[in-house]
């Protein structure tokens, strides 16, 4: 019977990987951008992708929701701000952090890196509980407050998260543009090198610990996590079937006690707990 549960978990992983890869390809369909050394500026760029996908990636056909939110907050265009916030709310209400589990290209990259064999994988970092609040701090300070209140003489702010932190932007936008554009290579300075360090640390940690960026840093995950308890797509635990055996938490790479908190703000809805539950106590509720 355990083998059956294990096979169900593997099938769930394959399905999720297929959806992730398909959406990553859809979000980055302008492959000519690399050969033409340009950023796509078609009509779809007015639409935000649900996951973290850099606007400046030459292949990207959608905008990044976090980049867009910073841009509109710093520009004082509140009508567009309401559009971006409304779009994030729609994604959150319907899917919650299922966006992170199925529709985020940078999440896919971390999933693939974690599959690389390593001598000792880590379940959590020291002070894990406190570190999980870091993404809310980054959301509040770097995505909202700094772009809104730290402005130049014209009243415009900067995209602080994109400029100083975002490893997805460095990988998808910064590195390709610097490699493809000689003028940008000459202009790349301290900030670019700083972000290379952040990217390198994120990628290396992703081999050892599951989704460190999503778990501790991502402000988009912080937004969607708030919706997990109220989103249409959420998990339910049948208390009559559940024996609190802990199989769900043991299989959860984010170390969530699903039996106690099935709609944790940390849950990315990968579905492995549901597939592995020996009592079929976990279900998807709408």
Q: Where does each model-flagged region fall?
A:
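Donor-sugar nucleotide-binding helix/loop cap in glycosyltransferases
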Residues: 260
